[in-house]
Amino acid sequence: MTEPILALSHICREFMTGDTKVAALADVTLDIDRGELVAIIGSSGSGKSTLLNILGCLDHATSGSYRVAGEDVAALDADALAALRREHFGFIFQRYHLLSELPALENVEIPAVYAGDTASERQARAERLLARLGMAERRGHRPNQLSGGQQQRVSIARALMNGAEVVLADEPTGALDRRSGEEVLKILVELHREGKTIIIVTHDPEVAKRANRVIELRDGLVVSDKRTDAAVATAAASLPADKPDTRSSRWSGLAFRFRETLRMALLSMAAHRLRSFLTMLGIIIGIAAVSSVVALGNASQNKVLSDISNLGTNTIEVFPGKDFGDARAGKIKTLVLDDARALDRQTFIAGVTPTVSTSTTVRYRDRESNVLVNGVDRSYFQVKGTKIAAGALFDAVAVRNIERQAVIDDNTRRTFFSDDQNAGIGRVIWVGKVPCRVVGVIAQQQGGFGSNQNLSVYLPYTTVQAQFTGDRSLRSVLLRVSDEVSTDLAQEAVTTLLTRRHSTKDFVILNTDDIRRTITSTTQTLAFLVAAIAVISLVVGGIGVMNIMLVSVSERIGEIGVRMAVGARREDILQQFLVEATLISSLGGIAGILIAVALGALLNLLLPGFQVSYSTFSIGAAFLTSTAIGIFFGYFPARRAASFDPVVALSRE
């Protein structure tokens, strides 16, 4: 005696309704042999659909034993049950359960996707099945473009896609007119003749007459099990080979399933464009904000540091006075040329320039304007990093001989001469009451501290002391520290030296590195604060992704049930919704990055001296962040989708 393909022994299935336990099946024992055409009949609530769900491994029994081809179903985990449904069963539903986003051909292919078949093999087999069922010309139509009978034919083709041994049909004619229902029954009878095991759940006695075995249920009990005179079909060998002879490798199967998952995610997004865009919007704003804040912070910092460099690179400057803002600083005359010479002899000093200054007027022909007169040494321009635009700088001889040679800045040139850079070279201007010959023009310095619209004239400091101030004391001593020496250590040494020379600390030191560090710290703090706000926006966007995905899961529970019924593993469902959430976040991240880059380019056009740039690292980090948000916030909805039992998901369609 051959082993039955399906064997149920003392099966019970109980449900809780409030505090009451209801038995849908009570002590059902059945054996179903290969090649049988079985009809399960009964009134509504008799337990026939529950029995069909247990037979198809969509539901589990409360007690009892169920074996499929000799294998105990109770010993199988969720993935093994999915494999059993995928390889042994085909389902035909009363409401068809076709996926609305897919055309008929791709609906038929779904079981083979989860089986890991190649795309070409899937398509060829699906086309053969549709052609066999008279649906070849409508393979590209979506479910809403098909009649009920046509949709049920597609459902039958899907049930046969993986070469199912057992076809389970739940009220297959219940939603069809008589003609369409008759066509579906003829197809099922034909499949039975070819060797398939067909189990039909119906309440229609006329449908049950087509079966060679009729099982009647009442209140969860088998009250009748009759066989007709019709012979059991055993001609399985004559059935065309719908099931593939070979499968792709495990890794290829994973790749195919992932590609299908990605395609389904894109289809779902396309079907709900506005919802997808609104979901992305939080991510777009967050990524654009974070990327822009980082880039703007770096640009601001670079701009400020560039402005600080205009004060001199690696420099410290000594001023008279007990402290900054000392009201008596102007009366302190102890900072003199000998101090500058003493500092110049120190090994850690790369350059020294004494400075004196005063304000006066400059006249050239009929033009007159107030200027700042700076008395400096030739090395001043090197220490400050100043570039010459035209002419030359005065030399050491001019300083020693107290010559009246002037170097003017670009503002002074434009005020008194034409826009030609060389226009003022060799001209004599009156600085106060002193005639001075212009020998050079320095290039305009962008930014800096204070207004860059001031007019400045640079003369040898000896000339300013002799011709203008009549004072031997200095306004300041500007020092350039050797590159290998810390400015902090140099500041301590200068303080020690001058305190010893003056017998008191009657000077203050401006360290440009201190300014640089302070401003850098400040800009970083501000950037951090703004970035924190942007990160909050990202988190809000991530929560939005999670909320929308939870809504999507609720709307697509029926789809989840269908996919599980045709063999999708829990990890396949998890992957599908996780990929969708990740895709939404990643596309939002890309859009946010593009907006940030466009904003940076616009700022660069509007503010030439302010250069916003985006590094490959920052762009990559922004993209990875958006992807991580999709994975993190999409995991919970995806896990919820994967946690449904197939029978529960199908019942909520």
Curated annotation (Swiss-Prot):
Keyword Coiled coil included in the entry's annotation: no
Keyword annotations of the record: Antibiotic resistance, ATP-binding, Cell inner membrane, Cell membrane, Membrane, Nucleotide-binding, Translocase, Transmembrane, Transmembrane helix, Transport
GO biological process: response to antibiotic
EC top class named in words: translocase
Residues reported to bind ATP: 42-49
Any single Gene Ontology cellular-component annotation: plasma membrane
Every ABC transporter domain range: 6-244
Compartment(s) where it occurs, according to its Swiss-Prot or TrEMBL record: Cell inner membrane
Membrane-topology descriptor: Multi-pass membrane protein
One MF annotation (Gene Ontology) recorded for this entry: ATP hydrolysis activity
EC number from the UniProt entry: 7.6.2.-
Keyword Cell division in annotation: no
Segments passing through the bilayer: 277-297, 526-546, 587-607, 617-637
Subunit structure comment from the entry: Homodimer.
Sequence similarity: Belongs to the ABC transporter superfamily. Macrolide exporter (TC 3.A.1.122) family.
Function statement: Non-canonical ABC transporter that contains transmembrane domains (TMD), which form a pore in the inner membrane, and an ATP-binding domain (NBD), which is responsible for energy generation. Confers resistance against macrolides.
Record protein name field: Macrolide export ATP-binding/permease protein MacB
Species this protein is from: Bradyrhizobium diazoefficiens (strain JCM 10833 / BCRC 13528 / IAM 13628 / NBRC 14792 / USDA 110)
Gene that specifies this protein: macB
